[in-house]
């Protein structure tokens, strides 16, 4: 058994967060209902008919104010829909997709106020669009060709006609496919735009302040990012590439010089640094400025750690035992890193206010020491010494949320070697109760918190 993804939501309408886990290796997913005190019931298993459920999305698909579940099955080339009831979920309804579906997004593609689904199919080089009837059921898929080996999908209105369009990264053909929506649930034939080598992830945003959506793509294989400016009519300019470090792994955006223009920060896993690219507000970016961080930079997050209204950066470094904090000067430059010790092999980092003092704190997962490190912020950009809390074996991902409705942030961690998740309840003073472990199968990896 190999659980792949974790989602969190209130599935039984008791105002208590529950957990859903997809499993790779058995034909079931597990739902763990929360008691509202940070504890959970034993999992209730729902059959999917797939041995490889690799992704999950949550939403109200039939407009009954109850959360439903969408599961991507990459071995059977299908998705499963499980409609939520007050006392659980109906048996899954299976909808065929293309071959080896990888990622899923939802949106209203035919302007009927009902959620629809788009799925990226890696081996069949297409996307499947399934229109929702508003009762939790979906029409048969309509497939649209894209490039080779598509991996990731995002949606947005690229031609300002109030109709959602689709953009897909194609890792095998080194381009992105843009499919314009007609507003009736169908899409025009793709238009392809070249990007760098092995494009993996895609984000949309307005980088030249013209209210027209643009595209930025992380090119894992060519050590750069591609920025593609939109004309607002559904077409895009030729890419402009900006060099970053070696093997960029994680990207975040924010306004680092307080000029109301979006900037980019990239964590480079091989060159052990971050690249900051300042935006000119016209869609172009200055040459990168590199800041040294730890070995094998694996995760980057931005936030204001010293309450000066200037964005700062925190980076987790997988082959080192610390996180690096770079304070922003508000002019686009950053102070030299300050390192804070954490456990062994920090793989993921998130921020939150764990002691309710309006100052951001840090939590990092430590894969080799089997714990998480919590560093409380002083509000001046510095942090207290780590407090470590044991979790399961080889923790890989972390998320935060209030699991017991006490207005205090709690922590959930996916442990890939012990096949479980750890929930640590927060006391609201920056400390946490001992973990409670919940068995989920084997090799849980990503974890996320989803609130309706």
Regions found by a protein language model. Name each.
Residues 1, 46-49, 94-99, 143-147, ...:
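Surface loop/turn motifs at the tips and blade-to-blade linkers of beta-strand repeat domains
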Residues 79, 83, 439, 443-452:
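Blade-level signature of beta-propeller repeat domains, shared across WD40, Kelch, NHL, RCC1
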Residues 29-45, 79-93, 127-139, 176-188, ...:
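Beta-propeller blade repeat segments, especially FG-GAP/WD-type strand-to-loop junctions
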Residues 15-17, 65-67, 113-115, 162-164, ...:
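Glycine-aliphatic tripeptides that mark coil-to-beta-strand junctions in extracellular
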Residues 4-11, 33, 54-61, 102-109, ...:
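Beta-propeller blade termini
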């Amino acid at each position: 058994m190999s659980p792949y993804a974790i989602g969190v939501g209130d599935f039984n309408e008791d105002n208590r967060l529950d957990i859903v886990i997809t499993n790779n290796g058995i034909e079931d997913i597990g739902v763990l209902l929360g008691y509202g005190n940070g504890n959970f019931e034993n999992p209730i298993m729902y059959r999917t008919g797939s041995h490889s459920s690799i992704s999950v999305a949550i939403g109200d698909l039939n407009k009954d104010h109850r959360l439903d579940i969408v599961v991507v099955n990459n071995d059977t080339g299908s998705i499963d829909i499980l409609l939520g009831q007050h006392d659980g979920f109906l048996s899954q309804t299976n909808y065929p997709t293309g071959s080896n579906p990888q990622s899923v997004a939802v949106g209203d593609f035919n302007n009927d106020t009902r959620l629809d689904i788009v799925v990226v199919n890696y081996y069949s080089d297409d996307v499947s669009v399934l229109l929702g009837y508003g009762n939790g059921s979906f029409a048969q898929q309509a497939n649209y060709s894209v490039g080779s080996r598509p991996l990731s999908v995002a949606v947005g209105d690229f031609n300002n006609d109030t109709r959602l369009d689709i953009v897909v990264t194609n890792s095998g053909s080194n381009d992105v496919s843009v499919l314009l929506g007609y507003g009736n649930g169908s899409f025009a034939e793709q238009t392809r735009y070249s990007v760098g080598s092995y494009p993996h992830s895609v984000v949309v945003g307005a980088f030249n302040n013209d209210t027209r959506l643009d595209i930025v793509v992380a090119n894992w294989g060519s050590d750069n990012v591609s920025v593609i400016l939109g004309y607002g009519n559904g077409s895009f300019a030729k890419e402009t590439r900006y060099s970053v470090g070696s093997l960029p792994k994680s990207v975040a955006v924010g306004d680092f010089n307080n000029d109301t223009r979006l900037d980019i920060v990239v964590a480079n896993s091989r060159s052990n640094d971050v690249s900051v690219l300042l935006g000119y507000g016209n869609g172009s970016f200055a040459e990168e400025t590199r800041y040294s961080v730890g070995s094998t930079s694996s995760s980057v997050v931005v936030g204001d750690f010293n309450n000066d209204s200037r964005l700062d950066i925190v980076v987790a470094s997988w082959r080192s035992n610390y996180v690096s904090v770079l304070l922003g000067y508000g002019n686009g430059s950053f102070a030299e890193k300050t390192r804070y010790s954490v456990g062994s092999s920090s793989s993921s980092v998130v921020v939150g206010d764990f002691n309710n003092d309006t100052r951001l704190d840090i939590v990092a997962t430590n894969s080799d020491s089997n714990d998480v490190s919590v560093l409380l912020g002083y509000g001046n950009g510095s942090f207290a010494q780590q407090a470590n809390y044991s979790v399961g074996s080889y923790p890989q991902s972390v998320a935060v949320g209030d699991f017991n409705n006490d207005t205090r942030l709690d922590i959930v961690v996916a442990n890939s070697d012990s096949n479980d998740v750890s929930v640590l309840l927060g006391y609201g003073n920056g400390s946490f109760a001992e973990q409670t472990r919940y068995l989920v199968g084997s090799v849980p990896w990503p974890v996320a918190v989803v609130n309706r």
